[in-house]
């Protein structure tokens, strides 16, 4: 099971604070670590500009749009928007986030400034979640392998679909996972769409409860210059709330990578392509 104990015992697999990387061996390490244990953290000690970060990212894969305007390097910081503001997005707030996935194969965070208090990153491997559900709640695991309705994201106006359907666990062999609870909740609140069943509601609560367990998730406090690469198809991530002082700033890149696995057909509406190694994910440009 890939739990927090596993990450403590195998830190050499996913962590490196060496300055001896070249682009070639960095890529090799990222591919190996994200396949093996889902993430790789490099303490580079150097903050990159957006341009340099994008150059590095493009040696690994294809940077994807993270907004309708075509943003490829997204600033994760507290913008002070209220939740009712149409510009509101979870990463643009200082709130604690639920465990979730994004819209890419590989997710890259680059820490520019850490919060004075809070803002700790949390990670859980899908294998861990699956195993616990198999043992504790097999009836809910079955529900999570069926489709949930998702409302279109407010940052995705170019998408012609107002909603789409997707399972949380989409592939048993690869343990592919996708979860964006807030879009499921928005679909649930839409009077024109069917409500979630009682079992679906219970399954969403259960998966968050599992991820919140101290013995399950890995906690990582990023430092300025850190580069964290995450297998977005096998890892859920979250972060704790942080002081709304305006200090915390991460750069985020979504990547489609050539070593990605084939996705189930049900993922086509969200990712646009399902073939292994395809350029897929992100938002359509408006």
Predicted regions, residues:
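Long, mid-chain structured domain cores
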Residues: 31, 35-72
